[in-house]
A protein has these predicted regions:
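Catalytic phosphate/metal-binding cores of nucleic-acid and nucleotide-processing enzymes, i.e., regions
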Residues: 54, 65, 73, 85-87, ...
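Nucleotide-activated donor-dependent transferases that construct or modify glycoconjugates
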Residues: 56-59
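Acidic donor-diphosphate engagement hotspot in glycosyltransferases and nucleotidyltransferases
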Residues: 69-70, 97
Length: 325
């Protein structure tokens, strides 16, 4: 479950998960068969099957390894010939868990941001040695492992050594992750400033405000109508991952969104950039209405793209995540 920069747990993320039975209710065998179908031809273009078609557990609001029915869910997908990819911190569970996943032949991206002396600065409450051990167990059982590395100022000097280690341990791939998480203050569970990641702190030793105040400042900035972003351009060039990849995001409570960038809990989540979505989301719980009906509101997001700016009602997260103008 996510917290804010290492501080207290975000009360906007209720603790929940999909059981194997619920998962099968949403993703029926018929839907799974359609997931693996090639993209239909357009004009003279032949039908295309993308290498990443399948189901990805991306850890948007938690870690796959926390799900009690995780292995059973993966086994269900594999039984229907669906490609499975998992992103995880990889610091939980006994050896048998990782061996079971390895024998299923799935892909797991292990988030390993440096060596033992740097990894914990961002991946708080994880044990680097345990992550490496779990990855080795998974690889030995036949799994395809990817070393996912976020470059920070504090670990860039270790990237070459990490790449060499990944190759030596049998990782199939080493991937740099560029997702904007490479800077900002980090806090303890008690909300006390711990350390700073990146280059946004002044050169003199000045601590940031306590984390609750930072969040409140962000919300005030949004609510005041002064919200601005460099990608909120007059003309948009949106590369929508939902439209391009036929992507759908299903949250752990069964609610459905066009993509993980828009995935949230509308009644409680404190992310100010998602506040306008509360008016758009309607009847989107697939456990209640089925997957197709839960997707019926998606076009209302695209309608906001015709507005002049985020201030005028454009979907903030679409602009920030997908505008290439």
């Amino acid at each position: 479950m996510r917290n804010y920069r290492g501080g207290d747990y975000n009360a906007g993320y209720p603790i929940t998960e999909l059981t194997a039975s619920q998962f099968r209710t949403i993703l029926t065998p018929r839907i799974l068969a359609s997931i693996m179908q090639p993209v239909p031809p357009v004009n003279d273009r032949p039908a295309v099957r993308y290498h990443d078609q399948g189901v990805t557990f991306n850890g948007n609001l938690g870690d796959f390894a926390l799900a009690r029915d995780g292995v059973d869910i993966v086994r269900y997908l594999c039984d229907h010939d669906v490609r499975v990819s998992i992103n995880t911190n990889g610091s939980l569970r006994p050896d048998t868990y990782w061996a079971d996943l390895g024998r299923l032949g799935v892909e797991i991206g292990f988030a390993i941001d440096g060596l033992a002396d740097t990894h914990h600065l961002y991946r708080q409450d994880t044990d680097w040695h345990r992550v490496i051990h779990n990855a080795e167990t998974f690889i030995s059982a036949g799994g395809r492992a990817v070393w996912r590395f976020i470059p920070f100022d504090h670990n860039r000097h270790q990237e070459a050594e990490c790449r060499a280690m990944a190759q030596r341990l049998g990782f199939a791939e080493f991937e740099n992750i560029w997702d904007g998480r490479d800077r900002g203050p980090a806090f303890t569970r008690d909300g006390v400033f711990s350390h700073h990641i990146g280059d946004l702190m002044p050169t003199e030793a000045v601590e940031p405000p306590p984390w609750p105040q930072l969040l409140e400042n962000h919300i005030t900035w949004y609510d005041s109508g002064t919200v601005q972003h460099e990608r909120d351009t007059a003309e948009l060039n949106l590369r929508c991952v939902h439209k391009m990849n036929r992507e759908v995001y299903i949250a752990a409570d069964g609610t459905v969104y066009p993509c993980c960038f828009l995935g949230f809990y509308p009644q409680t989540m404190n992310h100010p950039g998602n506040r306008e979505l509360r008016e758009l989301v309607q009847g989107n719980n697939a456990l209640e209405v089925g997957l197709e009906q839960a997707m019926s509101w998606f076009n209302t997001v695209e309608d906001t793209w015709n507005r002049a700016s985020v201030r005028e009602g454009r979907t903030y997260q679409c602009v920030v995540s997908c505008n290439r103008a």
